[in-house]
Amino acid sequence: MALTLQGEWIKIEQKGGPAPGPRSSHCMAVVGDKLYMFGGELKPQFHLDKHLYVFDFKTNTWSIAEPKGEAPSLSCLGVRMVAVGTKIYIFGGRDENRNYSDFYSYDTVKKEWKFLTKLDEERVPEARSFPAIAADDNHVYIFGGVSKGGVQSTPFRFKSTIVYNIAEGTWSQLPNPGPDFEPRGGAGLAVIDKKLWVVCGFANSTSGGINDYNSNKVQYYDLVSGKWIEVKTSGVKPSGRSVFAYAVIGKQIVIYGGEIFRDENGHLGPGTMSNEGYALDTETLVWEKLVDGGEPMTPLGWTANCTGTVYGKTGLLMHGGKQPFNNRTDDFYFYSF
């Protein structure tokens, strides 16, 4: 019998205000009763604005935060965001000319930006787009992503994981995961029970980019023992995919959609998107397929997504993304079970 998990999609009403509109390759995070959103593209490879959009779950309205302090100077796509306490952290991304952005924080109480790290300099992380991001109370974790070259000779995609110590304001790198660990962009990253989980992503082939592929591997780094482990999962496994939506719900990593076959024109084309969802139990290592309730979902990838607690439940928040005909949407959804 196939393993399934019943949940419900809720389409979030957007009642007004200066909304971000249709876009993909953007990022978002929740602090309290507000969601913060940044970056993205409407046409493939062309960035949009550099506003920080704020959605208020109490009123279901959008606003734009005043760019107070050391705000990002570059409008970018492939950027990532995570919340720690009352601050959000924004890492990387690029514009259509492959100018790359840096590392910033935004204090949601003071409503003020702060520049933290100039990327691509000695002894700091190299600039990149489409990495994966996660955090615990003390650290921001960045895995993989697409390189621009930087100060060192790098692969087209990274397989390294870099760590920002929030209290000290310093960067370090986790141990090398070994030769069999795939360099990837557009992967999922989550911290659960002192383990840093890496899920799926678009991987480098051994033939130098000709046969790059979407992976469905799952690995974790044990933050206590300092070791990388590749796990064997069972159940109803997802196919290989990248740039999917994901969130942590309890001990489960929930994923939705994503690109399952790359377009022959790369990022410029529509690719083949999925409309399936899955949940991985990180204790039993069993995948279950999500049975959708509520709003029917279209194949979708390249969304902004995060874990959020709204309507009294914790679940997956997802905005925008690329649809099957290479169009972008501004739909806003919440999934929980």
From Swiss-Prot:
Kelch repeats lie at residues 34-82, 87-133, 139-194, 203-248, 252-307. Changing residue 243 to C: Reduced activity. It catalyses: (Z)-phenyl-N-(sulfonatooxy)methanimidothioate = benzyl thiocyanate + sulfate; (Z)-phenyl-N-(sulfonatooxy)methanimidothioate = phenylacetonitrile + sulfur + sulfate; (Z)-N-(sulfonatooxy)prop-2-enimidothioate = 2-(thiiran-2-yl)acetonitrile + sulfate; (Z)-4-methylsulfanylbutyl-N-(sulfonatooxy)methanimidothioate = 5-(methylsulfanyl)pentanenitrile + sulfur + sulfate + H(+). It comes from the Eukaryota. It is an enzyme of class 4 (lyase). Keywords: Iron, Kelch repeat, Lyase, Metal-binding, Repeat. Pfam families: Kelch_KLHDC2_KLHL20_DRC7. A (Z)-N-(sulfonatooxy)alkanimidothioate binds at residues 46, 94, 130, 151, 186, 202, 243, 269, 299. This is Phenyl-N-(sulfonatooxy)methanimidothioate sulfolyase. The gene is TFP.
